[in-house]
Amino acid sequence: MAVILDLVVQGLQMLLVLLLAPLLTGLVRKVKARLLLRRGPPLIQPYRDLARLMRKEVVLADNASWLFRVTPYLIFAATWVAASLVPTFRTGLLFSWSADLIAIIALLGSARFFLALAGLDVGTSFGGIGSSREVMIASLAEPAMIMIVFTVALIAGSTQLSTMAEFLVSSEVGLRVSLGLALVALIMVAIAENARIPVDNPATHLELTMVHEAMVLEYSGRHLALIELSASLKLLLYLSLIACLFVPWGLVPAGAAAGMLAIGIAAYMGKLAVGGSLLALFETSIAKMRVFRVPEFLGAALMLGLLATLLLFVSRSL
């Protein structure tokens, strides 16, 4: 019976992240518009856009290979699985043994790898520019992410997200400077990985400074819908990761009554709403930086991750 309940909860989480991802994107757009004194699109507009793209015909370039065709499905599958592994409203899920931060980073890296190859596949100028910039950002963001994982794993004694969340929510952790530095570094990495301002502007489609949008200019129809949905899932994944590691309160422990799941889901949705609103506030108060300044931005994230690890070792040796 317990296995069946765990299976139902795991399926509920997979469905929940899939349904909430477009809503989170709509919330960010709505709050940004309100902050700029505009009405903005409705919250359900991303669902309408996805439905419209799903109905449209797929148009492919003459020289597009099989890689260009399968990449949207690979990106969507990898991102959805990675987002489903992050504990959102309950720990100890059925696949919690595989909810390892290193595995999640590997899944996201695989999706990025195929997207960069797809951008190069058709041989357009924008695709090549976007792919090269994406690889440049990834080469700087992944080392910073590894240092963040290293810091939190040393504190929690594990790289499994359920174990980390259960340990960090306990009273044994207390206030640690290293955790604060890791949080700031993770926020900076999340901004870069999701192509948000100031690293990139997701609202641009025909600018020389774009990164993510440059790689997907040749996609249309259901392929573009899957890529847009994957981008929303990735944003939800990083907000869920921040909530799981640094705001784990509200997570229902494994073995709790089924009625507690509603409290966990409500707490999770509240965290997403706060995180999306803060992201919108941040993006409306800062300008996009030049592409050549991005290495400095991610270099600062890497230094914060290194400093967090160093302070952790120093505090343990005292």
Q: Which sequence ranges carry the predicted segments?
A:
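Alpha-helical transmembrane segments
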Residues: 9-20, 96-109, 172-193, 263-264
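Transmembrane alpha-helical segments that form the membrane-embedded catalytic/substrate-channel core
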Residues: 23-31, 110-119, 184-201, 273-282
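Juxtamembrane inter-helical linkers in multi-pass membrane proteins
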Residues: 37-54, 201-223
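Cytosolic juxtamembrane amphipathic/interface segments immediately preceding
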Residues: 49-68, 125-129, 216-223
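Mid-bilayer segments of alpha-helical transmembrane spans in multi-pass integral membrane proteins
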Residues: 84, 103-118, 139-156
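Juxtamembrane/interfacial segments at transmembrane-helix boundaries in multi-pass membrane proteins
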Residues: 93-97, 151-181
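Interfacial loop-to-transmembrane junctions
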Residues: 278-304
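Juxtamembrane boundary at the C-terminal end of a transmembrane helix
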Residues: 308-318
